[in-house]
Structure formats: structure tokens, C-alpha cells
Amino acid sequence: MRFHDSILIFFSLASLYQHVHGARQVVRPKEKMTTSEEVKPWLRTVYGSQKELVTPTVIAGVTFSEKPEETPNPLKPWVSLEHDGRPKTIKPEINKGRTKKGRPDYSTYFKTVSSHTYSYEELKAHNMGPNEVFVEEEYIDEDDTYVSLNPIVRCTPNLYFNKGLAKDIRSEPFCTPYENSRWKVDKTYFVTWYTRFFTDENSGKVADKVRVHLSYVKENPVEKGNYKRDIPATFFSSEWIDNDNGLMPVEVRDEWLQDQFDRRIVVSVQPIYISDEDFDPLQYGILLYITKGSKVFKPTKEQLALDDAGITNDQWYYVALSIPTVVVVFFVFMYFFLYVNGKNRDFTDVTRKALNKKRRVLGKFSEMKKFKNMKNHKYTELPSYKKTSKQN
């Protein structure tokens, strides 16, 4: 092999090496859902003979209206909610024959109480008197035709939390979100409430329709505690929705912040039997924040304590500035008060009593209580000794 041929082979291999070294890693496309995995409508029969097509929907990773399994599975995962309203999946477990983390039991929260009064003639009970009556209470289950399609835990009074500065106010009718939660932009959160809380006092019926409002709240010290409804502050109002499941997903939008990093808002639910003029979002509303995302700095213990006390934004600066101002005003007032009343002050009585105490005559030594019983020998009774010759 000639020299120039070797050179050509060398450069060819070098260029091939550079090409291979600079190659990009193959990007594999994401696996698509197969036909069997995609959510499809399914057919069911409701109320005896009525055919109905049910279309599942996926919201924040949660599948609603999913076709139930033919055989009930006690270990089937269910969906709970974080304090801010984010969904989380709970997987039941069996430990020593007992199911842990099982689906929630709603007890009688969604049942209707029906009372029946029976007389002695109707029952003919051997232990009833002729004039006695028996009142029986019966709990009737709700219609679960549509609520059974909801995979998320429903809100009940036993899931309420405490809100307010002293944490002594129940959160009724809300279970989520918790007060002072932070909703981030482009994230979806679930607002949940106890449906039977909205019972019309006049008719005694539970509201069949409600809608959710989001309103801005100002927290400057001057305005704090003076929350009056301001119609322009309500920036989001949902359509009237069925009050069956007691929940609604909310996706936080960037335009709600109005070019700010975070905003203080209140979440409220309006039942259909209350008009817009009579509805107050702050009566039962939950206060929270919407934000662009996590802040870079980590809040200190002092900042967390201020947040728990309800001191946010620039309120702390007002409090810090007011303390020295009050002290200065107090000393100025005391100075002028003493200056004006300088000629009217007379402390002679006080000084005279103090001087008299210092000039007090002690009296005779023998009359003092402390030495009264002490026997005092005369000087002549003291022993005397004669001097010896050596002492002389």
C-alpha cells in the first residue's frame, strides 16, 4: 500500500469517527394508548328500562364516569384529595384479615330520614298500651345513579377543618381547599363542599343547582375586617352545575394574577335559592392564594408565624413603624404634662415624712423590746483581780 493511500484511509476513518461521535441519540416516540386503553363510551340501563350512553372524562388524571367492573373489587384504588384540592390515589390494603385505607363510609350523611308513627291498633304489640304510639325512623338511601360515577371522596361534615386566626371556625360547607392554600398557575384543583348544607329554610329542600365564585380579596390593614362584597372583585363565576357530587375542578389561569406574582382570593359557593344581590362570598368562603409558582426563598419561622397571625403583605411594616411612633408620642405628652404642672407640684409632705423617719429618736436602750428582758450587770459586779508582784 502506497503512502498517500494510507493517508486517505486515515482521514476517511477520522471523518467517520467525528460523524459517529456527533450523532444524536435516537428519540423514541411516546407510546400511544392502544384501542383497548382509550376511554370509550359505554352503555347502561338506568331506572329499570332507560338506556343511556356514558362518556368517561379525564380531569387532572382522574377518570370520571368510568365503567364499573363486573365483579366488585374491595381493593380497587380510589381518589382522595390533598389539603389544597389536588387529587391523590389511595390503594386499599388487607392486613390480618382487615381492609385498611378502604373506600370511605358516608354513614347517614346522604340519607333522608323518614318518620312513621304507629298506633296500638296498627301494631298490636303485646308490650304496648292501648293509648301508646310508636315512632320509627327510617333512613332512605339517596339515588346513586350518577353519584356512583364519581371516583373522588365526597365532602362530609366529619371532614371539615378549622379556619380563622384562632382556628376556631368550622369550614362548613367546604372540605377542600384548606384556608391559606396556594394554587399554582396551570394546575387543577378540586373544590369540594357538603351538598346538603345548602338546604332552603323555606322549602326544606336541598338546592339542586349551585355555582362557584372566585373573588379578589384585599388585605391592607385599613381594609382588613371590612370585607364588603364588591361585584368587580368577582373575576370568575361558573355556570349553574348539579349539586350532586359537591365538587368542581378549577384550573388556575395566568391572567387571573393580573401581572402579579400572587393574589389573595376567596372561594365561595352560591345556591340557586339565593339571589346575586343577597349572596355574600365572604360569609362561608375560603381564603387562599393563587400564585405563579414556588418562590425562590424559603419562608422563615417568623414569616410563617406572621402568616398564621394573618399579617401579610405590608402589614408588618405598618405594625413595626407604629410602635416607635406610639412611644415618641407618649414621651412628648409626658414632657408637656410635667412642664405645665411644674408649678403646681408640692412634694413637701412626702419629703417631710422621709426626713422624720431618718431623724427618729431611738429612745432608751433598756426600753427597747429587743433588749427589754436582757439582764444588765453593773460594772462594780464585774470580777476584779489583784496585781501580783510580777505584774508590778
Curated annotation (Swiss-Prot):
InterPro entries: Pma1 (IPR028000)
Site positions (Cleavage): R229, D230
A Pfam cross-reference name: Psg1
Annotated knockout phenotype: Leads to enhanced degradation of PMA1 in the vacuole.
GO cellular component: COPI-coated vesicle membrane; endoplasmic reticulum; Golgi apparatus; Golgi lumen
Residue intervals annotated with topology Cytoplasmic: 339-392
Residues annotated as transmembrane: 318-338
Record PTM: The precursor protein is cleaved into two polypeptide chains, PSG1-N' and PSG1-C'. The cleavage is performed in the Golgi apparatus by Ca(+)-dependent serine protease KEX2 between Arg-229 and Asp-230. PSG1-N' is highly O-mannosylated.
Ranges per topology, Lumenal: 230-317
Quaternary assembly: Interacts with EXP1. PSG1-N' interacts with ERAD-related proteins involved in PMA1 quality control including EPS1, CDC48, UBX2 and SSM4. PSG1-C' interacts with the TLG1/2 SNARE complex proteins TLG1, TLG2 and VTI1.
Note: Present with 606 molecules/cell in log phase SD medium.
Protein known as: PMA1 stabilization in the Golgi protein 1
Species name: Saccharomyces cerevisiae (strain ATCC 204508 / S288c) (Baker's yeast)
Gene coding for it: PSG1
